[in-house]
Amino acid sequence: TIYFYAMDGAIAKGVWDGMLDYDKFFQTNMRNIDTDPVLSKLMGNNSRSNYMIEERHTDQLDYNLAVNVQHNMRHNMRIVGGANLRVNRTNYYSEIKDLLGGDYWYDIDKFAERDMASAEAYQNDLDYYWATGHARIARVGDKYGYYYRAHLLETNAWANYTWGIGGFSLGVSGSVGYSNMYREGMWRKGLFPNDSKGDSKKLDYLTYDAKLALGYKFSGAHSIEANVAYMQQAPKFATAFVSPRTRNTTTPGLKAEKIFAADLTYNLNLPYIKARLSGYYTTIEDQSKVISFYDDTRSSFTNFAMSGIDKRYYGVELGLSVPVWNGLSVVGALSWGDYTYTSNPNFVQTVDNVDKIVLKDKVNWDGYHVESSPQLAFNIGLDYRGPRNWFAGVNFNYYDNIYLSMNPMYRTATAIKYYTNVLTSNTATNAQKASALSSIKTLRKQEKFDSAYTLSANIGKNWYIHRVYMLGFSLEVKNILNDQDIRTGGYEQMRMSKVR
């Protein structure tokens, strides 16, 4: 701040105003002597922190075992196979890093304290409360809030067969496996005393995949490749539970994911041009997703669990390189795709303060775009490979068709209930119905980001030492045009103010 003030007082003020007011946090914490009889007896004049810095832990213990075998057969045939085993245990917990001037943290669920009359209901560690008569007193380095473990067992056996003759190549591979996962709650949550501590339901899945690869080389300059695959994968632990920090409840409708993928590629390799043209098609079915956020309409922290999410990806990709003069080449790439949702997933909504489903509906996502990835990208540049292992390049990049990650609640019947009532009303005027229809379109419209372009350049050199070692140096400058308004992704707000 001193540096900015020397440069410009207005900038310094802006920087300071944008910072968190840690002075206020320290003063508030140091002056907060809790008058609760239990805390007064336990802690005396020690100050209770209302503000602090936490450190969220994801501590993994991961064991892997792999066995591979290979057999070369006659007539250019080879078979490779093996088996894999993975055992993973991950500890999830939050730890106090800094109490910001206070002496301790009283570990209770403040949202539950607001809504629940019973002291037991807002305990983060109910067993500790039963044993001591008060909530956990946490200091720097102590766990607080939540503590649970994720257990994962994965095993599979696989095989890969390849054969080639002349310009033709064939590859066939497959695997079959088993996946098991469950949650182990280390603390008993006061809101969910019977569904938070101990092991959850064991989730078991059969996994498999089958792949076929074909290739044919017409000549040294022309070749084609084709691949097709179908696989079934177990869902991720993060989407298997509606609120793993608080309880063992699994996501309703949870299924294994099914993936189909196919692609076709043509390769061109001539002295005056090198090119690669590919087309692809992929479908994903039965994905699941859990979004946790503060629901301002319910004044509670909520979990939005979706299942039956289907997606479709298809498109083309082109890459080329054209040498023009003494190591200088024109290079380019083009990628166009259409990534869309193809189903209306089911969802259930739960809140952390109630042990029941508060809302059940469908999300109208069919036809909307999959978020974040550019569905149109273009690159053209110059690439130079000089003597003595010098290299340099300059590239122009263009991106378009990038979409915002959607709030699923906006695409439910519940969110537009007020407007649909207007549309079906016999007393509403045409103007009111037109306004309601416009509001529905505004609510459900998916935001598309503006197109963007960047310019980058690089230069470098490699040194080979005794033909054994390589030492390299490279320098790259990206976004030379200093465009600071590029948006590559983001999330639609989860608050329902857009409805209002």
Where does each model-flagged region fall?
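Outer-membrane beta-barrel transmembrane strands
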Residues: 1-7, 49-94, 140-169, 203-207, ...
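C-terminal beta-signal and adjacent terminal beta-strands/loops
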Residues: 285, 330, 398-418, 427-435, ...
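Repeated loop/turn-to-beta-strand initiation elements of outer-membrane beta-barrel proteins
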Residues: 76-79, 167-170, 221-224, 272-275, ...
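Signature of Gram-negative outer-membrane beta-barrel scaffolds
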Residues: 52, 78-219, 346
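Transmembrane beta-barrel strands of outer-membrane/channel proteins
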Residues: 2-4, 81-87, 172-178, 226-230, ...
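Surface-exposed extracellular loop regions of Gram-negative outer-membrane beta-barrel proteins
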Residues: 1-2, 10-72, 132-135, 148-197, 202, 205-262, ...
